[in-house]
């Protein structure tokens, strides 16, 4: 099992959040699908606003939160992360980021672990290749803040390699 998914599953268990048994791969209910899609779209919007503002830490926070939301959807289903290559290269234009984020989020309307995995993989890839940050460390910080129920998003500036 993917280490980040394992951490999300442990967080869900600690708060008694509903999730299928690992490996069950149950289909999301329509309402679960709508709820997860709303979260993904909200996080996608936050990333685009951060890109517009040029705030690297906020972009990283958005990418990590979006990746977390994708992992949470996979955990709810009892699925596993499916590794797939990310087909994005920095072309100097942020519009390419907007397009690929929007496309990957939209594909999650299928409710498939494969599509949620693609969003998670894209977030990790963009964090490393576009932001030049430590996605693993940033996600760990986000999960720890959720575990302690911090309301304010943690500062991820230490996760940037600059």
Predicted regions and their residues:
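Flexible "arm" and connector segments at domain edges
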Residues: 1-162
